[in-house]
Amino acid sequence: LLKWMRDYNSNKNKDEQVYFYGMDIQYVKNINQKIRDFVLKKKIPINEELLNTLDKCVNKKIDYGKKSNWEEIQTPKLNEIENVLIEYQKNSKNENNTEFNSAIRALNYLKKYTYYVQNNYSQDRDLKMFENVQRIIENKSKNGKAFIWAHNEHINNKGFGNYNNRNIYNLGRHLKENYQNDYYSVGFDFGTGTLGGYIFTENKSNEWKTYKLDKPFSKTYAETLNQAKDDVYFIDMSIALKSKVASFLKKKTNQIILGGPGYNPNRNNL
């Protein structure tokens, strides 16, 4: 992706180039300092007690599965900071709106993370990612287009796998319902290659390891698709589902699913 972006942008005007914008709200490191630096630079009157809220929210760790009222306590304070920034921007003449908008955008990411601390399910994270994508498209895209890069489980149209019998809305499902035919998702599968995985070992430092897959797992889509003569290819599902391979594609079959920690040979990734 990085190489493609570099090649694509090399002969484009600045307004035609592709830019990176983060959409995830799972990590917010240094957002507090970014906002603090901005407030100090512009000499915006926000008291230190209120600014300390930024530090607390950035440093707050997520206790997955545990009940909390963190968002209910902290969000009103973050809203107060946002209101001061917006009001100061309205009253400022000849100021760089880009700097203000960047600070407010950072604050909104922190607000979404604060929400996620209290509501830490997959559908909550994906809802906030969807809201960020909307904001980016509406405010940053010159032509309404955006290229969204994420795991298959986030960008597919149908929602997450039915874990624990919960009907979970994911990012792709929100995007499909909102943008309808203007949203087109592309999923990736593979059969062989080198996979990275973050290994968690008790009483030891976590480490990143790589593992080699010499052949596809049996009884997977990849086992069949890997037999094609082309190394990389795309299948248009709208066409394929009307062809003679429809029965194969409609059949429930396993597929490798890798999340943030990557591949773990000791765990079933299918």
Regions found by a protein language model. Give the residues of each.
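Well-ordered, non-membrane alpha-helical segments in soluble/globular domains
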Residues: 1-2, 127-130, 165-171
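Long, well-ordered, tryptophan-enriched scaffold segments
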Residues: 4-22, 26-118
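Beta-strand elements within well-structured catalytic alpha/beta cores of enzymes
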Residues: 5, 21, 145-151, 185
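Generic, well-ordered alpha-helical scaffold segments in large soluble proteins
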Residues: 8, 132-139, 174, 178
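Loop/turn elements at helix/coil->beta-strand transitions in domains of secreted/extracellular proteins
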Residues: 13-18, 142-146, 180-183
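An acidic- and aromatic-residue-enriched active-site/binding cleft used to recognize and process polar
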Residues: 23-28, 152-153, 188-191
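Alpha/beta-hydrolase fold catalytic core
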Residues: 95-144, 153
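C-terminal regions of proteins
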Residues: 123, 155-270
